[in-house]
């Protein structure tokens, strides 16, 4: 449910015990019920948080999921092009092209996108985490971050396999160059770290340059970003 135009009021779960079902996974999703002078309105929890400019990147990064994330980014830009967006990431990674589509949209829109790692950010998940607005990339203390080079399988004639191998190498170079941009590390350092699976704890990821802050609790004051639209730590 993506109903974002309800009346402003305090949301409550109450005693209704209402849930909706995720159409993809079948998982139960809590429903928030709002009371207003115009009556009662219900939102699934993710739609309610989207009204607060919070987006979730969870599970495998693939084309359908990427399309949903991109649509939310574009919608929030249309709502307010100068107000920050918070992106919470808990993902094992996935398809490179799907992740790059999300990344390009993050760069394309006008609002700044703060990224927050909860749980894990591996492979393309770590890429999106590092791609957040500089100074606004956050990991919670028990988050795990993993980086590695892209992988893929090739089948068919030898010439087709050769073409696909060249494409993977080209993607690897592009990814390495972007990680250099995100982290400030040298290309040699990035290539070495990306050669195999490299797992990092939150503090290690901060030292490496993948995130800027490790927060155990939400700061009471604005300590993350400055300027118009800044809300400090993510909402």
Swiss-Prot record:
Key words, A-Z:
Cytoplasm, Hydrolase, Protease, Serine protease
What is known about its subunit structure? Answer: Fourteen ClpP subunits assemble into 2 heptameric rings which stack back to back to give a disk-like structure with a central cavity, resembling the structure of eukaryotic proteasomes.
Q: Give the species this sequence originates from.
A: Novosphingobium aromaticivorans (strain ATCC 700278 / DSM 12444 / CCUG 56034 / CIP 105152 / NBRC 16084 / F199)
Gene name per UniProt: clpP
* Compartment list: Cytoplasm
List the PANTHER family hit by this protein, alphabetically: ATP-DEPENDENT CLP PROTEASE PROTEOLYTIC SUBUNIT (PTHR10381), ATP-DEPENDENT CLP PROTEASE PROTEOLYTIC SUBUNIT, MITOCHONDRIAL (PTHR10381:SF11)
Instruction: Please give a single GO biological process term from the UniProt record.
Output: protein quality control for misfolded or incompletely synthesized proteins
The answer to keyword Plastid applying to this record is: no
What is the similarity comment for this entry? Answer: Belongs to the peptidase S14 family.
Q: Which GO terms describe its cellular component?
A: cytoplasm; endopeptidase Clp complex
- Pfam families under this entry? CLP_protease (PF00574)
Instruction: Quote the SUPFAM superfamilies the UniProt record gives.
Output: ClpP/crotonase
Q: State what protein this is by name.
A: ATP-dependent Clp protease proteolytic subunit
- Mind telling me which InterPro entries this protein's record contains? ClpP, ClpP/crotonase-like_dom_sf, ClpP/TepA, ClpP_His_AS, ClpP_Ser_AS
EC nos? 3.4.21.92
- Please provide, alphabetically and separated by semicolons, the GO molecular function terms listed in this UniProt record: ATP-dependent peptidase activity; ATPase binding; serine-type endopeptidase activity
Q: Which reaction does it catalyse?
A: Hydrolysis of proteins to small peptides in the presence of ATP and magnesium. alpha-casein is the usual test substrate. In the absence of ATP, only oligopeptides shorter than five residues are hydrolyzed (such as succinyl-Leu-Tyr-|-NHMec, and Leu-Tyr-Leu-|-Tyr-Trp, in which cleavage of the -Tyr-|-Leu- and -Tyr-|-Trp bonds also occurs)
Q: Which domain of life is it from?
A: Bacteria
User: According to its UniProt record, which residues of this chain constitute the active site?
Assistant: 123, 148
> What is this protein's function?
Cleaves peptides in various proteins in a process that requires ATP hydrolysis. Has a chymotrypsin-like activity. Plays a major role in the degradation of misfolded proteins.
What PROSITE patterns does the annotation carry?
CLP_PROTEASE_HIS, CLP_PROTEASE_SER
